[in-house]
């Protein structure tokens, strides 16, 4: 989804809306679907907010938990994410797996205190003033980073022009060699 803290600097409220990237169909075929939602988590980073001024006109900052910035503890059962410190994501979405031949391994998951907000999402700094109801954070742990391993079909399979097919300098392959990719749903 398309949302940023910069938008909230000039106005108190913004909407998180779908952000077409052009890779959704490819990722879906490869085995991952980045959902059009936002993760809110009770285990989250804090953001600085101006809460006043000192006598010398310097801004006084206070830090508040911002549920849209989940702090993720990596999967310690995989070499890629083992021994990594907690990761702060900003405006993350959930990732679902889809039917494909790829091996799928969740690398980062939210805490059990997760809430999912489907797009469009009203994002407001006024939420910092409100006490969050823990009962609403009941979605359980959700995948926000996924490792895909295997052979992947080219997005250009069956789409080459006759000129491209005849060109011997183009070493086109319908499928990749065995490889891996990581899909992370961080919105920043």
Residue ranges and their predicted role:
Residues 1-188:
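Acidic, S/T/G-rich, low-cysteine, solvent-exposed domains in lumenal/extracellular/periplasmic regions
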